[in-house]
UniProtKB/Swiss-Prot annotation:
This is Protein DETOXIFICATION 13. GO terms for molecular function: antiporter activity; xenobiotic transmembrane transporter activity. It comes from the Eukaryota. Its main location: membrane. PANTHER family: MULTIDRUG RESISTANCE PROTEIN (PTHR11206). It is found in: Membrane. Keywords: Membrane, Transmembrane, Transmembrane helix, Transport. It is a multi-pass membrane protein. It comes from Arabidopsis thaliana. Belongs to the multi antimicrobial extrusion (MATE) (TC 2.A.66.1) family. GO terms for cellular component: membrane. The keyword Transport applies.
Length: 482
């Protein structure tokens, strides 16, 4: 083990310097401005990275959709099923690295960052095995759940072609966190843009020219995930910028499995409980009168908020990385300033986006549909969607702060209560008993988001940052010896 790492381990035993809480003078001085600039420089390119990754699936869906209603319906159903049962779970589990790797990097335990990344790859690959069995039996499951047999059959074939992409995704997510937690966003930006630019013509060729049809969209997505993983993996292994955090493959990766899952499982619960609640709202919309209209409009609203959420995620990633780094280094005041800066940036961003949506609400629906009834309904929903953007922006950054601090278990309990004990019951009551239909469903789920945001704000506002820095340093010392 290198001298640098040994020195870092020893430093973890030193007492943390006690500092007073952040004051208005700190916010007026250059500390706040400097941190705000850091967050912007991190979040701006990270937003492009997240959007490029998000658009891979959208491009496949759009091209498959032009093949006909059956292809679109089956691909949409398969994508939704795979997101709920697979991709969301992988993303959630990988968020454990926001705490572990971020704080290790801040504590200058650079080699541990690489070891933790390998541990996460191994664990996520294992998780993919049972998920693969579920996907291979998707047709049977969908028919059992009452789906049309022809749609279920095509959806099952589509999901089977996504399996290679699932395993690639299980490696890609830890790699993304590896670079993100070191604030190395440029490799992510260049790689994501390159893969996206290649994905578009590749998807077109496989869908329209190869005879594969809708399966071509799934195969193109799997190939792009694999290519993305290969490029980032090569950079990790061979780039000089990664020399400090690069670690050789060894039995050491198995030592951290318990610690990884200790944070990964509540991380997955935190992410999936929120993600699944919105999918449940779409399912409930199918039980309403005129289900085609209600489902279409709610899908447009959900697609809009999901796209904009890419920007929220970028700010959340910046906040999570900066806070975990500063806590790992024992800098409690700096971590506190990050919170103020990140929330300030989020407020500016959500005001711009929500105002833009309100101003353009009458043309908003034309982006997604040419049906007048759908366009008018979307315009009616626009004010509610604007409120959703505000809530998503605030809770997204607060969730990033929670991951940076290692509060995933708290976030999981909050999301469980806010959405499943509060939001969804209200949504069902408003939609089916008060007869507000799709509007009621959306109001209900946003009631859950309001409670989620308030509780996360309360937890963050009551935080003793000196104690959090102590916990981070003690966690590093306990996990990696002294």
């Amino acid at each position: 083990m290198g001298d640098a790492e040994s020195t870092s381990k020893t430093s973890l035993l030193l007492p943390v310097e006690r500092v007073e809480n952040v004051t208005w003078r700190d916010l007026r001085d250059g500390l706040f401005t400097a941190e705000l600039k850091r967050l912007i420089c991190f979040a701006a390119p990270m937003a492009a990275v997240v959007i490029a990754q998000f658009m891979l699936q959208i491009i496949s869906m759009v091209m498959v959709g032009h093949l006909g209603n059956l292809s679109l319906a089956s691909a949409s159903l398969a994508s939704s099923f795979c997101n709920v049962t697979g991709f969301s779970f992988i993303v959630g589990l990988s968020c454990a690295l926001d705490t572990l790797s971020g704080q290790a990097y801040g504590a200058k335990l650079y080699r541990k960052v690489g070891v933790q990344t390998y541990t996460a790859m191994f664990c996520l690959a294992l998780v993919c095995l049972p998920l693969t069995l579920i996907w291979l039996n998707m047709e049977t499951l969908l028919v059992f759940l009452g789906q049309d047999p022809s749609i279920a059959h095509e959806a099952g074939r589509y999901a089977a072609c996504l399996i290679p992409g699932l395993f690639a995704y299980a490696v890609l997510q830890p790699l993304t966190r590896y670079f993100q937690n070191q604030s190395m966003i440029t490799p992510l930006l260049i790689t994501s843009c390159f893969v996206f630019c290649l994905h578009v013509p590749l998807c077109w060729l496989l869908v329209y020219k190869s005879g594969l049809g809708n399966l071509g969209g799934a195969l193109a997505l799997s190939f792009s995930n694999c290519l993305y993983t290969i490029i980032l993996g090569s950079l990790m292994c061979f780039s000089s910028a990664c020399s400090e955090t690069r670690a050789p493959l060894s039995m050491e990766i198995f030592d951290g499995i318990g610690e990884f899952f200790r944070y990964a499982l509540p991380s997955a619960a935190m992410i999936c409980l929120e993600w699944w609640s919105y999918e449940l709202i779409i399912l409930l919309s199918g039980l309403l009168p005129n289900p085609q209209l209600e489902t279409s409009v709610l899908s447009v609203c959900l697609q809009t908020t999901a796209t904009v959420y890419s920007i929220h995620l970028a700010i959340a990633a910046a906040a999570s990385t900066r806070i975990s780094n500063e806590l790992g280094a024992g800098n409690s005041r700096a971590a506190n300033i990050v919170v103020y800066a990140a929330m300030s940036l989020a407020v500016v961003e959500i005001l711009i986006l929500s105002t833009s949506l309100l101003v353009g609400r009458n043309v908003f629906g034309h982006v997604f549909s040419s049906d007048k009834e759908t366009i008018d309904y979307v315009a009616k929903m626009a004010p509610l969607v604007s409120i959703s953007l505000i809530l998503d922006g605030l809770q997204g950054v607060l969730s990033g702060i929670a991951r940076g601090c290692g509060w995933q278990h708290i976030g999981a309990y909050i999301n469980l209560g806010a959405f499943y004990l509060w939001g969804i019951p209200i949504a069902a009551s408003l939609a089916f008993w008060i007869h507000l239909k799709g509007v009621g469903l959306w109001i209900g789920i946003q009631a859950g988001a309001v409670l989620q945001t308030l509780l996360l704000t309360l937890v963050t506002g009551c935080t003793n940052w000196e104690s959090q820095a102590d916990k981070a340093r003690n966690r590093m010392a306990l996990a990696y010896g002294t």
